[in-house]
UniProtKB/Swiss-Prot annotation:
Annotated stretches, region: Disordered: 1-32
Protein name according to UniProt: Prokaryotic ubiquitin-like protein Pup
Organism expressing this protein natively: Corynebacterium glutamicum (strain ATCC 13032 / DSM 20300 / JCM 1318 / BCRC 11384 / CCUG 27702 / LMG 3730 / NBRC 12168 / NCIMB 10025 / NRRL B-2784 / 534)
Role summary: Protein modifier that is covalently attached to lysine residues of substrate proteins, thereby targeting them for proteasomal degradation. The tagging system is termed pupylation.
One MF annotation (Gene Ontology) recorded for this entry: protein tag activity
Record's subunit section: Strongly interacts with the proteasome-associated ATPase ARC through a hydrophobic interface; the interacting region of Pup lies in its C-terminal half. There is one Pup binding site per ARC hexamer ring. Interacts with the Pup--protein ligase PafA and with the depupylase Dop via its C-terminal half.
Pathway: Protein degradation; proteasomal Pup-dependent pathway
One of the Pfam families matching this protein, by short name: Pup
Length: 64
């Protein structure tokens, strides 16, 4: 999967304060997106190797 970047724009207030807040928020979103992409890649790899065992490990007995 490709890493995606998300840009967050703030509204209202002084431009100087918003520019700093937007830069911090944007960086945090990028870090979280990369972590999610990494996790999804790991899950895809497990499913390719043995999907049935992967599903069994998360399904409770009795259909609960």
């Amino acid at each position: 999967m490709n890493a995606k970047q998300t840009q967050i724009m703030g509204g209202g207030g002084r431009d100087e304060d918003n520019a700093e807040d937007s830069a911090q928020a944007s960086g945090q979103v990028q870090i979280n997106t990369e972590g999610v992409d990494s996790l999804l890649d790991e899950i895809d790899g497990l499913l390719e190797n043995n999907a049935e065992e992967f599903v069994r490990s998360y399904v409770q007995k009795g259909g609960e």
